[in-house]
């Protein structure tokens, strides 16, 4: 019975937040970019640590450039995650605009639908 309930939850989620293939492709592309940069950062950090442990002047001098590259990569990852978050929020907002009466959109404004009282 739990499987059925889980399936109901997932199918409901899928219906509510359907994303088109292009949006999913963009998410996938961004996540691949992020992972590539994080892998590169791991290599940079390893090299920085080795240079630091060697205590050789030329290796320590090289660390300045490596740390700059690492910082730039971190900024790029933060930007990519920000773009992903923005895209996801837009897609959720777009899919929820036609939902039930009296709800609030993510911007805090009420939907324009009106309620009528009987009587």
Curated annotation (Swiss-Prot):
Signal peptide: none annotated. Its main location: nucleus. GO terms for biological process: photoperiodism; positive regulation of circadian rhythm; rhythmic process. Residues 91-119 are annotated as: Disordered. One of its GO terms (molecular function) is protein homodimerization activity. It is found in: Nucleus. Keywords: Biological rhythms, Nucleus. Residues 93-111 have a biased composition (Polar residues). Induction: Follows a light-dependent circadian-regulated expression with a peak at midday, about 6 hours after dawn. GO terms for cellular component: nucleus. Belongs to the EARLY FLOWERING 4 family. Homodimer. Component of the central CCA1/LHY-TOC1 feedback loop in the circadian clock that promotes clock accuracy and is required for sustained rhythms in the absence of daily light/dark cycles. This is Protein ELF4-LIKE 2. It comes from Arabidopsis thaliana. The gene is EFL2.
